[in-house]
């Protein structure tokens, strides 16, 4: 997050940009994008074809041949950054080692600028900044409240040892206009280890400031401000979601 913790529970940070369907899109654009960034992202993988669904759940007219597309997944040399590009979509993932917010933000801006440079005028329909954390509890029995400040409180006779739990809350923000999807739970990783999940996804969509004025996507001002505000909100939610003693142990 903003403060670089000595012990980071972060496993992945990502920013997802979804744009309005554009006549400027063509199937050659992902490979043109790769050609521009291949020195930084030498590994390129074509993912299985994706059938797009428009915002609002309305299916895209599949008679348009370029709407059922394979996405390109680009990786840097140490696999710490993954960029996905597809029709009206750009996703920037940052895995470990995660350095700091400023570097991640600048990476998002560079990749977004490259996308806009290649496709031309675009409108942003949805943007999300998401941080996924895995907290490793001790083996055996443990109390969730040792780690999280947001946890299930159950009355008797339900006050029993939990085999698992999942909680999802959605909080509305005014500035910027957004929803924070806050998820906690117990999950099992691919290696079989059980961890506590803290997943924070800050999402703005149907963005009035862009759609109502018919402006094109502006990376130089509005988007930079949105990223910084979104990160501040996610960081505050992260800190307040943790037991204060546990948070101190991470610093």
What do the predicted segments below correspond to?
Residues 1, 69-78, 82, 93, ...:
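Aromatic/basic-lined ligand-recognition segments
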Residues 55-58, 127-134, 239-251:
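Short, highly charged C-terminal tails/helix-capping segments
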Residues 1-85, 91:
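N-terminal low-complexity, intrinsically disordered segments
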Residues 83-132:
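Aromatic- and glycine-enriched beta-alpha-beta binding-site module
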Residues 9, 13-15, 170-172, 245-246:
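Macromolecular interaction modules
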Residues 17-21, 94-96, 200-206:
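Short beta-strand-to-loop capping motifs
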Residues 36, 40, 107-118, 230-233, ...:
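Conserved short hydrophobic interaction patches
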Residues 195-251:
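Long, compositionally biased interface segments
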């Amino acid at each position: 997050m903003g403060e670089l913790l000595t012990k980071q529970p972060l496993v992945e940070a990502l920013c997802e940009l979804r744009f309005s369907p554009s006549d400027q899109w063509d199937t050659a654009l992902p490979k043109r994008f790769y050609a521009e960034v291949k020195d930084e992202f030498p590994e390129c993988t074509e993912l299985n074809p994706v059938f797009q669904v428009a915002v609002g759940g309305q299916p895209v007219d599949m008679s348009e041949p370029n709407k059922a597309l394979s996405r390109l997944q680009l990786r840097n040399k140490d696999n710490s950054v993954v960029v996905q590009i597809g029709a009206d979509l750009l996703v920037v993932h940052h895995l470990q080692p995660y350095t700091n917010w400023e570097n991640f933000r600048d990476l998002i801006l560079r990749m977004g600028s490259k996308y806009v440079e290649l496709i031309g005028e675009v409108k942003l329909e949805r943007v999300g900044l998401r941080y996924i954390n895995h907290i490793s509890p001790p083996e055996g029995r443990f109390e969730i409240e040792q780690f999280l400040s947001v946890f299930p409180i159950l009355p008797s006779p339900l006050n029993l040892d939990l085999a698992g739990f999942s909680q999802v809350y959605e909080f509305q923000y005014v500035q910027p206009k957004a929803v924070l999807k806050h998820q906690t739970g117990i999950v099992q990783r691919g290696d079989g280890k059980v961890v506590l999940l803290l997943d924070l996804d800050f999402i703005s969509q149907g963005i009035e400031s862009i759609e109502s004025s018919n402006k094109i996507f502006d990376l130089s001002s509005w988007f930079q401000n949105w990223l910084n505000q979104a990160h501040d909100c996610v960081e505050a939610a992260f800190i307040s979601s943790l037991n204060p003693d546990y948070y101190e142990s991470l610093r």
